[in-house]
């Protein structure tokens, strides 16, 4: 219950002088703050107050003494005034106030006026009483005086626990020894008003800290409290600090972020989240919008609703200031980030420029070396030009010029390689080469100049060319040198050369074949040599010409090879014409034809023999007369001399047709006239010895001789009971057995040879892998039949590589071989291909 109604005046207003004695019952902020304060002033209720409450009487005359030294104000006593003449001096009054201040306990009035309960004020005529208990002062002064002459129990207990007098307390005697010194303040001013109040002991135990640092720290602390919470909360605000390294890391990350798309940067955005419509012209402008509240909206309306005491009002809100501060912070961060990027850019630029400086220095040194080398090269070239002047004192020779070019190539290779060697050679070397070969006779001394030209080939020829052809004239100095300087001498010599005198020309080209370019050699053979040979073959007559044609055609085979094939057809034609009236008794035909056997293909050679030689041999063998008593063997010898020239099958065919029928007929007639079997045996063995093993191994020849043995055995067996030459039957049986055994041994030996050949071939095939495709099979068959199988360089048909199989041109497509016909390509079998190639 409030007592405010007791202190109202007649008009119902409270008296201002009575505010100090008014006490409200509501809970104030001071009550909340001093709820747990043990030093707050408490009012102890007496028994009378507890009984009568607010109606308890106050007896000012019988008030009990209090420790405060003051009595409660007696408002019933008359008002006393202090005379001005009796007023104490300033010094005495100050002393009394000091004593009062020292003795006055902490009361509620010492706290701020707005924090404690308001008391009833007294008028200016009232003074607080300074009286205390009447008899308590002296008693307190003598309290504990018995300790002056004896030791207390505490001292004894400490000594029992190990205390040593003169040392500090604690396990390690870390306590203080001397009591804390006190220093009396000079006046009544505040702390620090009269200078430092620290004692000597305090200065020793706690050295003086830097006052400026303390002041700065205190200033920063107070500065952070410039906006104070009106609720009285002492909670310190939390600050987040960003270091420079964090800002640098943030800047490095932001550089990696992708830039917004250009399409989105031009989009019109209408913001209707506020009180009014706002228009932005890009999404990036939305991020720059600050959180300033709309005008006209009360601050209280923007705060979230809270209940009771938790509803706290902010001290004051300054969104513009916060926005400006945020802008300053962001600008500072951007400046730091930009400075870091600029610093990194400058560092990178320094590194880049240092590298460029090093590279530039290297380039400069290289250019200086190049300039020095070029000046030396220029000096050598100028020396060559000076010595090439006509009527000079020291004319330049081809060997000396080669040594100068070798110096250029060895010491100044880069400059020599990059220089235009063609122009340099044309200006210097060509005149010297012309002068060197002006008296040259190639057919007399074919190797003249090969050494010096070989040296110039290594100096002038460009090894980087992919193809060496006539198109290299503009880029290769050596090819141009040989074509423009050396080739005219060769043309003059070939124009005066006789093809029948082939050896000097062949030796000359053999000497220069490895020096001159390939295309120049091909040009010589195709355009100069072959036309001369073709013309000479057309003029050759085998019947009247005493010089065999092979003597001046075949020496060109190593150089020209397949280029000579167009000459073979007219040669065969002329030889066929010459053999029309030939008789086997003329051995010159064999001498003329024998060199051509290895040149012509097996098929063409066999065809030539069957057309021109075999019929003549058959006629000769048909004229042979077999007479056991008087045998003329000339015709037989003429035929058998051609055994190596014609094939075994052709020779066996001649024997089967023209020899064995007559020979068996003579044998039968001889056996029917009581012959001498010993003579028949000798005659049989004599004729058999006239044939070579290759002919005897032929099955047809074996059959004929076995037939003769059978005839002899039948003749011996059929004459049983008649007169028989003693031992004839045994001799014929022995002869038959011997011949059969020889045939068996020969067949066994042939089989063994074939097995060995197959074994060796199998080892070779296993070592070189079995043919896995049709092309490998054709190549294997070509090797077995001694047929040339090789690709035609630069020739294709429908993207397929062309090959030469003997004289036939073929190509392979998906396991099928195609042969070139008259108008189209015809597929054929492998065996037919082999027969056609032969």
UniProtKB/Swiss-Prot annotation:
GO terms for biological process: biomineral tissue development; cell differentiation; extracellular matrix organization; negative regulation of protein-containing complex assembly; spliceosomal complex disassembly. GO terms for cellular component: catalytic step 2 spliceosome; chromosome, telomeric region; cytoplasm; extracellular matrix; nuclear speck; nucleolus; nucleus; spliceosomal complex. This is Tuftelin-interacting protein 11. Its main location: cytoplasm. Coiled coil: none annotated. Residues 711-735 are annotated as: Required for nuclear speckle localization. The keyword ATP-binding does not apply. A motif (Nuclear localization signal) lies at residues 701-706. It is found in: Cytoplasm; Nucleus. Residues 1-74, 86-137, 193-237 are annotated as: Disordered. Residues 14-29, 92-101 have a biased composition (Acidic residues). Widely expressed. In tooth it is expressed in ameloblasts and odontoblasts. Residues 1-51 are annotated as: Required for interaction with DHX15. Residues 1-13, 45-65, 102-117, 218-232 have a biased composition (Basic and acidic residues). One of its GO terms (molecular function) is nucleic acid binding. Keywords: Biomineralization, Cytoplasm, mRNA processing, mRNA splicing, Nucleus, Phosphoprotein, Spliceosome. The keyword Nucleus applies. Identified in the spliceosome C complex. Found in the Intron Large (IL) complex, a post-mRNA release spliceosomal complex containing the excised intron, U2, U5 and U6 snRNPs, and splicing factors. Interacts with TUFT1. Interacts with DHX15; indicative for a recruitment of DHX15 to the IL complex. Interacts with GCFC2. Belongs to the TFP11/STIP family. Changing residue 168 to A: No effect on nuclear speckled pattern localization. The modification Phosphoserine is found at residues 2, 60, 96, 99, 145, 211. Residues 150-196 form the G-patch domain. Involved in pre-mRNA splicing, specifically in spliceosome disassembly during late-stage splicing events. Intron turnover seems to proceed through reactions in two lariat-intron associated complexes termed Intron Large (IL) and Intron Small (IS). In cooperation with DHX15 seems to mediate the transition of the U2, U5 and U6 snRNP-containing IL complex to the snRNP-free IS complex leading to efficient debranching and turnover of excised introns. May play a role in the differentiation of ameloblasts and odontoblasts or in the forming of the enamel extracellular matrix.
